[in-house]
Amino acid sequence: MIKNYADIIPEVTELAKLCKNNTISPDLYTKYDVKRGLRDLNGKGVLTGLTEISEIISSKVENGVEVPCEGILTYRGINVKDLVKGFIQEDRFGFEETAYLLLFGSLPNSTQLDSFRNILGEYRQLPPGFVKNI
């Protein structure tokens, strides 16, 4: 049976609702002077911190002076090094868990992870004749 890759299955619709509830208040754009394009009027990159999806810490204050430090990258408040360490210790890849975390704001429980993996698996299959047509 040929899979229609444009089909939206009910599970995807439910997950999309989670993303819809994860929006940024329009008031915060004004409060923090965040522009809605990729650059502000001065050519600087826009602030991405409102999203709380990721944070990069690249400096610290020492004796009142901001100095570079070993960088820290967090996804949804979780240090990426800790995520990777867990994946390595438990001998798993972690792609699906990380994608779920970034999309929906928290790490999945085992039931959510199994469901998410199944959904991704359904859309991961190549259409018939793909390799032949390349």
Describe each PLM feature range.
Residues 1-134:
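Hydrophobic alpha-helical bundle cores within soluble ligand-binding/oligomerization subdomains
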